[in-house]
């Protein structure tokens, strides 16, 4: 039975404005993971990174910052800074499959170098001032790599091991390897969290049926595509047209304020959200094409209004249960 639901970090989507506005309308999430930042070699935070992790902006939400690096020294520096801000946990990103990231040996690219990863963990867990959780994939090339990775993870007191059951080269395509996740669940010495392809209540319930001992999940794209998903998993109601209209208006205004009145930039941020949210609606194919191509904020506002007025919410996500 699922007891804990984490909001996964989606780079470019679940930033500070989105997290704050989303939390005002929906619910059911226990923790919000802040999209990763990479410490600079000079141990400085960029203004953009500082804005995201500034504890003043996150203290009202239970938040966990995520760090992506292959340098133990840089990671430890980041942990010291985050502890001083008030955070009580730091998450290490070993899951990002982006080619620009993995080419530098970071994210899931670090999984291709287990000896270096072991040295990293040796230093981090001997000196770290905060509990460290890890978000990982099964490996870099093949799922069979995970057995050795799990042996490595079991040597350290990882606060929580979040497993996305794909390898780097699969990115987010193809079926997840639930047989390998079963091995993680059975053999991990650390708490395990499941992440991957949870978009409906039905998919979460199917996961619970197959793995009755799973109590912790992390959901990202599913909570953007159906903002009421976590609430429904807690027994609450699905979303409706009015709630979505109010949420999107508040989000658009939030982006406009954040970008100091630059409405064009705010509309671009909304386009990114609609990449996922459009799947909540039936009969929206034509308007979705327009969403991808709009050039002005006025065009965006017209298209969104037409979707909300004319496209029905999909019947399989509208109710409390699926």
Where are these regions (language model features)?
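Alpha/beta catalytic cores of nucleotide-metabolism and tRNA/nucleoside-modifying enzymes
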Residues: 1, 5-6, 11, 16-17, ...
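Short glycine-enriched, charge-decorated loop/helix-capping segments at active-site entrances
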Residues: 105-111, 170, 234-235
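Glycine-rich, positively charged N-terminal anion/phosphate-binding segment
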Residues: 10-81
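Active-site beta-loop-alpha junctions enriched in small/polar residues
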Residues: 10-12, 37-39, 68-70, 95-97, ...
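Alpha/beta enzyme core
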Residues: 21-26, 76-90, 94-104, 115-190
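N-terminal small/glycine-rich loop or linker at the start of catalytic domains
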Residues: 1-4, 40-62, 96, 101-104, ...
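Short, charged, surface-exposed secondary-structure boundary motifs
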Residues: 42-44, 171, 226-232
């Amino acid at each position: 039975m699922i007891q804990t639901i984490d909001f996964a970090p989606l780079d470019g989507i679940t930033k500070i404005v989105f997290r704050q506005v989303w939390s005002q309308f929906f619910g059911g999430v226990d923790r919000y993971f802040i999209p990763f930042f990479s410490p600079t070699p000079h141990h400085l935070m960029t203004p953009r990174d500082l804005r995201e992790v500034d504890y003043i902006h996150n203290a009202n939400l239970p938040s966990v910052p995520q760090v992506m690096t292959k340098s133990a020294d840089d990671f430890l520096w980041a942990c010291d800074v985050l502890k001083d801000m008030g955070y009580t946990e730091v998450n290490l990103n070993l899951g990002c499959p982006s080619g620009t990231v993995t080419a530098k040996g970071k994210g899931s690219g670090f999984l291709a170098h287990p000896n270096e990863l072991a040295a990293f963990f040796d230093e981090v867990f001997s000196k770290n001032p905060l509990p460290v959780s890890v978000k990982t994939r099964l490996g870099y090339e093949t799922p069979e790599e995970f057995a050795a990775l799990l042996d490595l993870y079991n040597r350290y007191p990882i606060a929580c091991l979040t497993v996305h059951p794909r390898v780097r080269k699969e990115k987010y395509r193809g079926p997840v390897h639930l047989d390998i996740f079963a091995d993680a669940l059975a053999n991990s010495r650390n708490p395990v969290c499941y992440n991957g392809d949870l978009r409906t209540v039905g998919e979460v319930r199917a996961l619970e049926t197959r793995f009755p001992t799973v109590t912790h999940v992390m959901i990202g794209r599913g909570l953007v595509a159906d903002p009421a998903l976590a609430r429904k998993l807690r027994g609450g109601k699905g979303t409706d047209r009015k709630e979505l209209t109010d949420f999107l208006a508040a989000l658009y205004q939030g982006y406009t304020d954040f970008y100091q009145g630059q409405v064009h930039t705010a509309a671009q941020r909304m386009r990114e959200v609609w990449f996922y949210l459009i799947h909540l609606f039936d009969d929206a194919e034509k308007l979705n094409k327009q969403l991808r191509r709009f050039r002005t904020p006025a065009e965006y506002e017209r298209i969104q209004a037409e979707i909300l007025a004319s496209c029905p919410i999909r019947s399989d996500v509208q109710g409390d249960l699926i």
